[in-house]
Structures are given as structure tokens and as C-alpha cells.
Regions:
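N-terminal auxiliary segments of SAM/dcSAM-dependent transferases
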Residues: 1-27, 35
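Class I SAM-dependent methyltransferase Rossmann-like catalytic core
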Residues: 21-67
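Conserved class I S-adenosyl-L-methionine
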Residues: 71-80
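Class I SAM-dependent methyltransferase SAM/SAH-binding core
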Residues: 89-138
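A short SAM/SAH-binding and catalytic strip from SAM-dependent methyltransferases
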Residues: 154-178
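A short glycine-rich, Lys/Arg-flanked "PGG" loop and its adjoining helix->strand segment in the class I
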Residues: 175-187
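Conserved beta-strand signature within the Rossmann-like core of class I S-adenosyl-L-methionine
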Residues: 184-198
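Substrate-binding/catalytic lobe of Class I Rossmann-like enzymes that use SAM or dcSAM, i.e.
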Residues: 205-287, 295-301
Length: 324
């Protein structure tokens, strides 16, 4: 925990010291409470990505698997509650008697509850939760398979990355991330990635400003976490949630906007931080994609684009990639 907190502290100091735009890495939004709040966001009527992606999986889960001839081992990056993955569970178990499933998530407590629930309800699914970041989590999965004498030429790993999480990366970061995933795959493996597509601006902005206020709570929770874990003294009532579409960058941006001129501290740091009225802390971005940008990203990352599965409105795409 000390090492994790030290990394947390270092990242926060770097982000909040930027004179052009204060920022906080979005991965720190997902502590146990943040993960819970995000699950609440996904069921709000304004938040189209989850239900749209779920409808694609419900309709096409069998088709998604049709090019995979070998036994499937399923690895999910950022598994959350694994609700959407159920459609793949059902389709995979029509092809094979049992399934080895490795959910990877940075929230250990949230992951633990999901694993226990899955093991209770699905006798044919062997679940091993991996509490780690995505790339190290995939490496952990590969090590577990190797240590348990799995023959890598006898099965295909299907790695899934749902929820348009790829959009939380800067474009170059997304390329580097997919390259790192590619380095841990072989030519029998597949990668299924969710992409939120560019669409009506109002629809996109509405999804990140739900009436129930869960997205605002989710955003503000990072300040609570910093108060608790880093000894900060943020007054949450002096910040408001802001989310909007940046047309130039093709992305939704989430910010915390200061209501007044303020000062705050970080325990163990010998400086006082200042933030002006109207100034923001950038907490998350979500890039929206076109087909052309998806194709370019795949090629630059070392993948071939095998197939695209979309909803009737083309709001969301599930893209099957294969190492080349």
C-alpha cells in the first residue's frame, strides 16, 4: 500500500503542478467507491455506451467467436462487474465444456466480490481474478497458464477490452498500449475492443452529465480519495463537475471546476497549491472514433482488423483484432 500511495502521490504532484492545465490521471478515479459509482453510471438512461455495447454482445456473441477454432481462454481487461461478458460466457460454453476466465481490475475489493459471485453461479467457469493494471495483469495470466502446464499452441486467448476504455487513452498512448498488449499475444490469439463512435454532440455530452448526478459524484470522489490517502484538504463543496465535447480533439473531457480562489495541500509536500476561480482540474477524457481512425490505430499497433460488430445506429463498434 505504501508503494501504491507513493506512486499515487508522485502522479498527483506532477499533474497538479502543471502550469498550463492541472490534471489527475483517470486511473485514480477507480477506487472501490469510484468503481461502484461507475457501475451506477452505466445503468443511467443518458449513458448509452454500456447498453449499446451490451446489445451488440447479445446479438453477435456467437458470430464474434466464429473465427476462433481452438479452445478459448478469456481474459478481460478492466472487468468491472463482468455483466456484459455473460453473453460471451454463454456462447463460449456452447463451443467447449469449461472456460478459464481471468478478469483483470485495479480495484481488488470490487474484483474479489465479482469473482466470488461468478464462481458461485457458474460451475463450468474457472475464475482467477487478477488485481493488477492491464499489461501486468496479462503477464500474470500468461505466467499462471505456464505454471499450470497449459500448452500455448492448444488454445486461443481472447482478450477483451470493453466499455470504450480505449478512449481514455491519448491517441499515441492507445497505440503504445495496444502494442504492449500485442507483445503478450501470439498469432492464435484475438483482441476484442469496444470503440465509442463520433455522433451527435448533445447525445455524447448528455451521457456524461446524468440527471441523477452519479457522474458528478464519481468525478468528485477523486478529491475524497486524495483527502483520505494523501492527506489533502480539498473542500468538495467548492468544486463542480464539468463535462463537454472537445470538437478539435474528438473527445469528451471531464473536469472539476473551482468555484473560488482556493489553496490546498498534499501531506508531505512543503508547498501550498493554489487554484483560481473558474480554473479546472482535468480528470478524464474519452476519445470518440471513426472507422478510419480505428483502422489506422490497428495498423500502427501491429494488428489486422478482422471484423466489426455494430449496433443499428452505429453509435458503438466492437472490433475484433488479430496480431499480424
Amino acid at each position: 500500500m505504501e508503494n501504491n500511495n507513493e506512486e499515487f502521490r508522485t502522479d498527483i504532484l506532477k499533474g497538479l503542478s502543471n502550469p498550463i492545465q492541472k490534471s489527475i490521471p483517470s486511473k485514480y478515479l477507480y477506487d472501490s467507491k469510484g468503481s461502484y459509482l461507475f457501475e451506477q453510471i452505466t445503468v443511467q438512461p443518458e449513458y448509452y455506451p454500456t447498453r449499446t455495447e451490451n446489445s451488440i454482445l447479445e446479438e453477435y456473441s456467437t458470430n464474434i467467436l466464429h473465427n476462433i477454432s481452438k479452445e478459448i481462454i478469456l481474459i478481460e481487461m478492466g472487468s468491472g462487474s463482468s455483466k456484459k461478458t455473460k453473453h460471451l460466457f454463454d456462447s463460449i460454453l456452447k463451443k467447449q465444456d469449461k472456460l478459464y476466465y481471468f478478469p483483470i481490475d485495479i480495484s481488488f475489493n470490487f474484483l474479489d466480490s465479482v469473482v466470488n459471485d461468478l464462481e458461485t453461479k457458474n460451475q463450468n467457469i474457472r475464475v482467477k481474478g487478477i488485481p493488477n493494471d492491464y499489461i501486468n495483469g496479462i503477464k500474470d495470466c500468461n505466467n499462471i497458464l505456464f505454471e499450470n502446464n497449459f500448452k500455448f499452441d492448444s488454445f486461443s486467448r481472447l482478450i477483451v477490452f470493453f466499455g470504450s476504455s480505449i478512449g481514455n487513452f491519448e491517441i499515441d498512448e492507445a497505440r503504445d498500449f495496444l502494442k504492449a498488449v500485442r507483445m503478450n499475444m501470439n498469432d492464435k490469439d484475438f483482441l476484442l475492443v469496444g470503440f465509442d463512435m463520433i455522433k451527435d454532440e448533445f447525445l455524447m455530452e448528455h451521457a456524461y452529465n446524468d440527471k441523477a448526478g452519479f457522474t458528478a459524484q464519481f468525478n468528485l470522489n477523486i478529491l475524497s480519495r486524495m483527502n483520505r490517502e494523501l492527506g489533502c484538504n480539498f473542500d468538495l463543496s467548492e468544486y463542480i463537475h464539468s463535462a463537454f465535447f472537445n470538437k478539435k480533439e474528438d473527445r469528451i473531457e471531464m473536469h472539476l471546476k473551482s468555484k473560488s480562489d482556493q489553496e490546498f495541500i498534499i501531506s508531505g509536500c512543503d508547498r501550498i497549491f493554489k487554484i483560481s476561480q473558474g480554473e479546472t482540474i482535468h480528470t478524464e477524457r474519452s476519445y470518440k472514433y471513426s472507422i478510419e481512425k480505428i483502422q489506422e490505430l490497428a495498423i500502427r499497433s501491429g494488428f489486422t482488423l478482422e471484423e466489426i460488430f455494430s449496433d443499428k445506429n452505429n453509435w458503438f463498434n466492437l472490433v475484433m483484432l488479430k496480431p499480424c
